Regions:
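Short glycine/threonine-rich turn/loop motifs
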Residues: 42, 58-87, 156-252, 315-412, ...
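N-terminal secretory signal peptides
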Residues: 48-54
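Post-cleavage N-terminal segment of exported redox proteins
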Residues: 1-35, 113-178, 261-329, 333, ...
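Axial heme c-ligation environment in periplasmic c-type cytochrome domains
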Residues: 59-62, 82-103, 108-133, 228, ...
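Short extracytoplasmic/periplasmic juxtamembrane "stem" segments immediately C-terminal to an N-terminal membrane anchor
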Residues: 33-48
Length: 460
């Protein structure tokens, strides 16, 4: 009997040691002989990311067990709601370039080792994120950004998820001048009272600083006006992404019944055709003269020049360590630590993806007001339920000038906006000191337009 017990103890120890050795072996990183994207893909596949973050999740066998199954299905629901990784993994397989938001999210989750969750990797051996795996992903993310952006970042800042604005737009200056005139021309509206600049003033941060903009006859819109500065960096235009280009965006407000309320572009063209200056300029620049396409093309060409480089933060990114104070640098580190830089990425610190408003806390329930059509966000265009309350992420350049904040204009100050973003998106309660540091960083994002620091005629 005693020998039997001893044998059992030895066998158990051997199983434990063997299991530990097997477990450690399964945690090794993919071979360095593989291409970087193939190594990252292997880590993501081993981590079981597709099990939750997909419209077509790979449901594990224990999902059909009572109680455990409910937990699994809730994790899948939450995972897909937060992030769909399937398109990114498909691009990794193809060796194609990813959206920079995908890169930032994958890198940050690996860095924090937040995924996969312990309850997953304790069942699925080898899936756990390790320092070695995170290092592979970090190196890939850095190399990706150096290839994706051509902005001169090098050294310790080459891998930053936020990038400097390098202003060198390749534009036709005559079209720019024409677009400037059209941008400020009230004849695009039905009663000749509203222009693009009425809601997007160049002297007011590219916005009007109103909760909702005022259109013809005093009509009020239903969504906060985004800035036109740096809009060229957005992957789509409008909060709901209904315009793919600046030209498409420019075609919207003139025919919007609340904003400019013209009945057609034929009506607008008839007005402009009575202006000898416009007739001459359009004839010189476009073979077919004044048309809807040419009007919006000229406005687009002008808006491509509305970039604001050389902010204090840009100077710091490009190597001037004296450009930011210690508190401003701390604010940037807090910005990254609290996952802000997984959505607010790139040169515009945003405008690269659609994200859910109220990811971790119920924003609209807490707001306590009736839902509007504009609150539906991307859903307005797609009618896909997952897109409800998803919005194009706003850029943060010149944010100190573009109050009020959010799509509904409900936050009057940067302090309010920062504090509530952390709560509703990340379930984080920031201290007053942390909020102050992040706001100090955000103020460093105000850049220059035509060689002068951007300012606003409006005072908050």
């Amino acid at each position: 009997m005693k020998k039997t017990v001893q044998y059992l103890i030895v066998a158990a120890l051997l199983l434990l040691v063997g299991g530990f050795i097997t477990y450690r072996a399964m945690l090794t990183v993919p071979s360095a002989e593989l291409a970087p994207e193939a190594r990252v893909l292997a880590i993501l596949e081993e981590g079981g990311c597709i099990s939750c973050h997909s419209a077509n999740p790979k449901v594990p066998f224990y999902a059909h067990i009572p109680v455990a199954g409910d937990m699994v299905m809730k994790d899948i629901e939450d995972g897909y709601r937060a992030y769909d990784i399937e398109p990114a993994m498909a691009k990794l397989k193809e060796g194609a370039m990813l959206n920079p938001v995908d890169v930032a999210k994958i890198e940050k989750v690996a860095q924090d080792k937040r995924m996969p969750m312990a309850k997953y990797y304790l069942v699925h051996w080898g899936s756990q994120m390790t320092d070695a795996k995170a290092a592979v992903i970090a190196a890939w993310a850095r190399d990706y950004r150096m290839a994706y952006y051509h902005d001169g970042l090098s050294g310790e800042r080459a891998g930053e998820p936020v990038r400097p604005i390098i202003a060198n737009p390749d534009v036709d200056q005559r079209k720019v001048a024409l677009g400037y005139s059209l941008y400020h021309d009230t004849r695009l509206s039905v009663d000749n009272t509203v222009s693009c600049a009425s809601c997007h003033g160049l002297n007011t941060g590219g916005v009007d600083n109103l909760k909702y903009s005022k259109g013809v006859a005093g009509n009020m819109g239903g969504v906060n006006a985004p800035t036109t500065y740096n809009a060229v960096y957005n992957f789509v235009q409008f909060w709901d992404g209904r315009a793919k280009t600046l030209a498409e965006q420019a075609a919207g407000p003139p025919l919007n019944p609340v904003e400019m309320a013209s009945t057609s572009f034929d009506e607008i063209i008839a007005k402009l055709a009575g202006d000898k200056h416009y007739v001459a300029e359009f004839s010189a620049l476009y073979a077919d003269g004044i048309t809807e396409a040419n009007i919006t093309n000229a406005i687009e060409e002008f808006e491509r020049t509305l970039v604001t480089p050389n902010s204090k933060f840009d100077q710091w990114l490009l190597g001037n360590n004296e450009a930011l104070s210690a508190d401003e640098v701390l604010g940037y580190e807090l910005f990254k630590a609290n996952n802000c830089a997984t959505c607010h990425v790139g040169a515009n610190l945003g405008g690269e993806s659609y994200e859910l408003m109220g990811l971790r806390q119920h924003y609209f329930e807490a707001r306590g007001t009736e839902l509007t059509e504009e609150d539906n966000g991307r859903y307005k265009q797609t009618q896909v339920e997952r897109d409800r309350h998803r919005f194009k992420v706003p850029g943060l350049r010149n944010i100190e000038l573009t109050w009020p904040y959010y799509h509904d204009g409900t936050r009057a100050t940067m302090e309010e906006a920062v504090r509530d973003m952390a709560l509703y998106q990340c379930d984080v309660v920031l201290t007053d000191a942390e909020v102050a540091s992040i706001v100090a960083f955000l103020r460093t994002l105000t850049g220059e337009y035509q060689g002068q620091k951007l300012t606003s005629d409006n005072k908050q």
